[in-house]
Amino acid sequence: MEQPIQRHTISVLVENKFGVLARVAGMFSGRGYNIHTLNVGPSHDPKVSRMTITVREKEETLNQIIKQLDRLVDVIEVVDFREGDTIFRELVLVQVNITKSTRSEVIELCDIFRAKIIDVNPNQLTVEITGTEGKLTKFIQLMENFGIKDLTRTGKIALPRAE
């Protein structure tokens, strides 16, 4: 039976050095793997960065990716995050078109979704929202009804739940 393609989230702790991101990206491209999302930032230790990578692959391919990442120089730890024991979040910044007649409805939807309005002008609101992928997708779909001028979305970030 063929394995299904699924989305997987991998956390990679790396030494915070020049060229590490290029080596990780090169491993993916050199083996024909696609990175669906990638976030990189410092961890609690300034000498260590955390890469959160999502891929859409079969389980067997995921295992290969993890093994290959673990072999790279400057990689400290590779963890495959599973949905049940991990907290996932994303961030979206969206500029939504508004009119006098739609302004209150957009603001009400922002309140319902616990989004923050971070910039206002007569024809637009800039909104910041964090949450799960599903929550953000639904919010974006609702904002499309008003007209989205611009949007940027982070990939997933993740941490294991506290024990």
Give names to the regions the model predicted.
Residues 1-50, 54-163:
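Long, contiguous binding/interaction regions
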